[in-house]
Amino acid sequence: MHVKKGDKVQVMTGKDKGKQGVVLTAMPKKDRVIVEGVNMIKKHSKPSQLNPQGGIVEKEAPIHVSNVMLIDPKTGNPTRVGFTVVDGKKVRIAKKSGEALDK
C-alpha cells in the first residue's frame, strides 16, 4: 500500500474531492484508509455506560486507497509514490520531486 498512518493525503475523487487530511488508519487487507475530516458519516448510538446520552455521532468512514494521493513534502502538491532501495531498505519516494517519504 502506498500510504501509511500519519501521511498527509488529498482526496482525488468522490464527494470530498480536493480535501486534504492526515491518514488516521490504514487497512492494507481491505485496501482502505481513514482520513481525518473526510467522508464523515452520522452514526446513531444507543445510550450506554460510556455515553449515557446516546444520540448521533459524526465520524470518519473508510475510503478506498485508490481515491487518495500523497502530498509531496517539497512542493505541497499531490504526487504518485514510487519505491527505491537505499542501503538494502525499500524506501518510498515522491515521483514529482524525488524526495524520500520515509525517514
UniProtKB/Swiss-Prot annotation:
Pfam families registered for this protein in UniProt: KOW (PF00467), ribosomal_L24 (PF17136)
One BP term from GO: translation
Gene Ontology MF: a single term: rRNA binding
Keywords: Ribonucleoprotein, Ribosomal protein, RNA-binding, rRNA-binding
Keyword Membrane: no
InterPro entries: KOW, Rib_uL2_dom2, Ribosomal_uL24, Ribosomal_uL24_CS, Ribosomal_uL24_KOW, Translation_prot_SH3-like_sf
Top-level taxon in the UniProt lineage: Bacteria
Subunit structure: Part of the 50S ribosomal subunit.
UniProt-recorded name of the protein: Large ribosomal subunit protein uL24
Organism listed in the record: Exiguobacterium sibiricum (strain DSM 17290 / CCUG 55495 / CIP 109462 / JCM 13490 / 255-15)
